[in-house]
Amino acid sequence: MNNNNFVAVIDSEQMKDEMARLPGEYASVIEELAKARVVRARAEQEVKMIRFVVEKHERDLFKNGIVDKKPTEDAIKMEVALHPKVKAAQEALLDAEEKCYLLEAKKEAYNCKRDMLVSLSALQRAELDTLRFSGAR
């Protein structure tokens, strides 16, 4: 097939079905995204809280006489960063962020689909108007 002779066929019924289905699907994505953002915010708070608890624990080891030498700030930071609970909380945060990014991409895809359907609908109306006016002469 020669690319210069390509003709796009617009199926009016399929386009109407897509236009009818789009708002509900879009609303579902928006709802999922809102929930995912809440999960992400909670995960951020969880990371902060766990980091605080672990840091406090590391500082209390010296205060309570469990370790003889006062830990340096760098040593405390390293212990916090390597703590399994901190790592698990950060992994949960990354998972929550990933879900948000994917849903934001899905939302953008629906926006593009809506724009495309509006453009196709306008193109179809213009073609019908052209046929009406050319046939009226």
PLM-predicted stretches and their roles:
Residues 1-137:
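Charge-rich amphipathic alpha-helical interaction elements
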